[in-house]
């Protein structure tokens, strides 16, 4: 059996879609009993409990597509680019609005996604 190198693993991960990466992270978290957010929790542990909860709530945002507007095709293209979904899945998401496009992302990533969606004609909300 050929030995797999770190470079092989990195190359494989580079070619994965966003959804595949999310599934991989979840499987690794389950297998090893860890959380990808652990470094944030360690830093927050030094602060008082109430402050830690408030900080944690404000670090993750959801981008909600409220409606596609008049340029539905443009919105589908942006949704595909942001999520890595296939054409049918992206169309179903846009048709089923209001639906979340991205969950648990940083404020910067949420604002960038909202900007792209609004520029394509969509009505978007960040929660």
Curated annotation (Swiss-Prot):
Q: Annotated Gene Ontology MF terms?
A: mRNA binding; structural constituent of ribosome
Please name the taxonomic classification of the source: Bacteria, Pseudomonadati, Thermodesulfobacteriota, Desulfuromonadia, Geobacterales
Name of the protein in question? Large ribosomal subunit protein bL12
Q: Name one GO cellular component term.
A: cytosolic large ribosomal subunit
Q: Where is this region: Disordered?
A: 98-127
GO BP, sorted A to Z:
translation
Q: Which gene encodes it?
A: rplL
Classification via Gene3D superfamilies = 3.30.1390.10, Single helix bin
Subunit: Homodimer. Part of the ribosomal stalk of the 50S ribosomal subunit. Forms a multimeric L10(L12)X complex, where L10 forms an elongated spine to which 2 to 4 L12 dimers bind in a sequential fashion. Binds GTP-bound translation factors.
Alphabetical UniProt keywords: Ribonucleoprotein, Ribosomal protein
- Keyword Amino-acid biosynthesis listed? The answer is no
């Amino acid at each position: 059996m050929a030995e797999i190198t770190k470079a092989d693993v990195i190359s494989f991960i580079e070619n994965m879609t966003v959804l595949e990466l999310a599934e991989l992270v979840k499987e690794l978290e389950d297998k090893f009993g860890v959380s990808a957010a652990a470094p944030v929790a360690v830093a927050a542990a030094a602060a008082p409990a109430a402050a830690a909860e408030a900080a944690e709530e404000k670090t993750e945002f959801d981008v909600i597509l409220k409606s596609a507007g008049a340029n539905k095709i443009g919105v589908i293209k942006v949704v595909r680019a942001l999520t890595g979904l296939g054409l049918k899945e992206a169309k179903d998401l846009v048709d089923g609005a209001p639906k979340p496009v991205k969950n648990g992302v940083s404020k910067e990533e949420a604002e960038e996604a909202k900007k792209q969606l609004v520029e394509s004609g969509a009505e978007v909300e960040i929660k």
